Design a protein with these regions (language model features):
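Leu/Val/Ala/Ile-rich N-terminal alpha-helices, chiefly Sec-type signal peptides and the beginnings
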Residues: 1-42, 48
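Short amphipathic alpha-helical segments that mediate assembly, nucleic-acid/protein binding
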Residues: 24-31, 43-48, 54, 96, ...
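Short, charge-rich amphipathic alpha-helices with coiled-coil/heptad character
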Residues: 35, 39-73
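Asparagine/serine/threonine-enriched low-complexity, disordered tracts
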Residues: 55, 80, 118, 136-139
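Extended alpha-helical coiled-coil "stalk/arm" regions
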Residues: 64-128, 159
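Amphipathic alpha-helical coiled-coil segments
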Residues: 120-159, 166
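Short acidic DE-rich linear segments
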Residues: 171-174
Length: 174
């Protein structure tokens, strides 16, 4: 919402959402002083209506943020469980690789038995590729989910701060 304030020497346009998003009560007091001494004192009423509208929407917006926060929290927990399972699978396969290497290294190199054991080591290492790729994807997904959760929590907290600030502004207006 924009306020068009006219006074003796000219006029000014105030983008109310951006102006109030700074949350500086001193700036609001100055703006109210300018509005009250201007040719358009009805801007104060427009400002009051805008703030009341924002305050009325507070509960609905908070509920929406809360729903998203709960959903993202559950998704993060599930993703962390999946990562733990994948890491466990990788550790089991790595144990198999170690055992196969130990058995292979107990024989002379380039003998028939050594070659058979070496084939086993290669099989285990091949089996490691898929879980490692999966783990990489899961970590990326977890990072994205945590980022989305953080953004919603930030919006939730910002909304609470806005409500407190709007209460102060309403006290200044009345």
């Amino acid at each position: 919402m924009d306020l068009e304030i006219r006074y003796e020497n000219g006029s000014m346009t105030v983008h109310l959402e951006e102006f109030l998003s700074e949350r500086r009560i001193a700036k609001v007091r100055k703006l109210l002083k300018v509005i009250r001494s201007s040719f358009t004192p009805e801007c104060e009423q427009q400002m009051k209506e805008f703030i009341q509208e924002q305050t009325e929407q507070f509960e609905q917006v908070q509920k929406e943020h809360n729903i998203y926060i709960e959903g993202y929290t559950q998704k993060v927990k599930y993703a962390e469980q999946q990562i733990m399972q994948t890491k466990h699978r990788i550790s089991q396969i790595q144990t198999g690789v170690k055992n196969a290497r130990f058995l292979r290294d107990s024989h002379r190199k380039n003998t028939k038995v050594w070659k058979n054991r070496n084939a086993d080591v290669k099989k285990y290492r091949e089996r490691l590729k898929e879980p490692r790729a999966t783990l990489k994807e899961q970590n990326e997904e977890l990072r994205n989910l945590k980022n989305l959760l953080w953004q919603r929590q930030k919006a939730f907290d910002g909304n609470v701060r806005n409500k407190e600030f709007y209460k102060k502004v309403m006290q200044e207006i009345t």
